């Protein structure tokens, strides 16, 4: 398959979405069931949503929630999905809350189709706002943006808030990523019931797909989750809308905001590569003019 050195260039990708309980074993079982369903539908690479082992605890700043973090090495969920990936011959990016000595990260382990752990990506952009208080729990990632060569394709994986930054997508594609994946946890805004970001959310990522001429897969959770905070209860209704976009940004598969789902789409990566080269987007780049992107204030210092 493309990117992995094998024959052929057609790759099937999947996004799954489901409602999370606060019982880890139930969520991991659900993820496995849906991965198996995606495999039956022909998927080679299957994306599960962000932090799927439990409910989205970042609604609150609570010390007890640090107990949910686990080390990368020896992580039982990663080991379980390594076995599953090998059995089904599918690639699985596994999202988890990582403890690394005194640091904590929002991380994804990339599991290849033979069960090999290809490495780790740690979320780079950490949000901090009502209902999404991730800076309390997570250090900014230190891995940098990566492209992982799997059996079926070279892939790039960003995590949730990363998806709002075009620099993240471009950096992964520049390193050879043929498909972009974004595990996500996004829904209503506790401070403003009238704010609905789902269409904006989709359009931003559709832009990444179109600007880089690569397919893109986003997996989001569904369901209403209430967490006890230091100020009372906080509730988010996660809006699902997991989707798969084609290389011009067109949505080819879309889930709704309420139902568990498994989306699968096939892409010919050789054909997409030829189109990408033909457009000249990467030929005509001017990195010498982009130094301003390395600043916070736009000054050319």
UniProtKB/Swiss-Prot annotation:
Pathway note: Amine and polyamine biosynthesis; putrescine biosynthesis via agmatine pathway; putrescine from N-carbamoylputrescine (amidase route): step 1/1
Record bears the keyword Hydrolase: yes
Classification via InterPro entries: Aliph_Amidase/BUP, C-N_Hydrolase, C-N_Hydrolase_sf, N-carbamoylputrescine_amidase
Biological process according to GO: putrescine biosynthetic process from arginine
GO molecular function, one term: N-carbamoylputrescine amidase activity
PROSITE patterns for this protein: CN_HYDROLASE
All copies of domain CN hydrolase, residue ranges: 11-269
Reactions accelerated catalytically: N-carbamoylputrescine + H2O + 2 H(+) = putrescine + NH4(+) + CO2
Disulfide bonds, paired cysteine numbers: none
PANTHER family xref list: BETA-UREIDOPROPIONASE (PTHR43674:SF2), NITRILASE C965.09-RELATED (PTHR43674)
Name of the protein this chain belongs to: N-carbamoylputrescine amidase
Annotated source species: Oryza sativa subsp. japonica
